[in-house]
């Protein structure tokens, strides 16, 4: 029997504790879980991808079956095929997230019918945490320590120094 390989993608700009929770839970479902940092052309970048990757690798270092990869200008299904992933993992906070994700699921299935999407619901304590909300708090100098992993906080502090 072949290994179960999953792919969880996002812009992770920045990664939140909600992302971390979904990744930790998804890692228990697969032999190998890739976490793909994707550049979203519709979003203004806050942290450079290199900083995001470094922060994610530190935050996920305790998960032996998880590997962080970065991708520019590729479709998720193409990355999944390249990595041998047959499952896409998506986190859902609310009905709006499901509606948004369903359209991508449709196209992904059209492009590769052997790739399935698995949805994991956010835990109640993470329902209202979003990367855009964290960026907004940062814009106004607010403390975000309770919303992001320590390694991400370090990357943000280091980026602000430069």
Swiss-Prot record:
The record marks 19 as: Transition state stabilizer. GO terms for biological process: coenzyme A biosynthetic process. ATP binds at residues 11-12, 19, 91-93, 101, 126-132. Its cofactor is Mg(2+). GO terms for molecular function: ATP binding; pantetheine-phosphate adenylyltransferase activity. It is found in: Cytoplasm. The lineage of its organism: Bacteria, Bacillati, Bacillota, Bacilli, Lactobacillales. It comes from Streptococcus pneumoniae (strain Taiwan19F-14). Homohexamer. One of its GO terms (cellular component) is cytoplasm. The keyword Nucleotide-binding applies. Reversibly transfers an adenylyl group from ATP to 4'-phosphopantetheine, yielding dephospho-CoA (dPCoA) and pyrophosphate. Substrate binds at residues 11, 43, 76, 90. Pfam families: CTP_transf_like. Belongs to the bacterial CoaD family. It is an enzyme of class 2 (transferase). Its EC number is 2.7.7.3. InterPro entries: Cyt_trans-like, PPAT, Rossmann-like_a/b/a_fold. Keywords: ATP-binding, Coenzyme A biosynthesis, Cytoplasm, Magnesium, Nucleotide-binding, Nucleotidyltransferase, Transferase. It catalyses: (R)-4'-phosphopantetheine + ATP + H(+) = 3'-dephospho-CoA + diphosphate. This is Phosphopantetheine adenylyltransferase. HAMAP family: PPAT_bact (MF_00151). Pathway: Cofactor biosynthesis; coenzyme A biosynthesis; CoA from (R)-pantothenate: step 4/5.
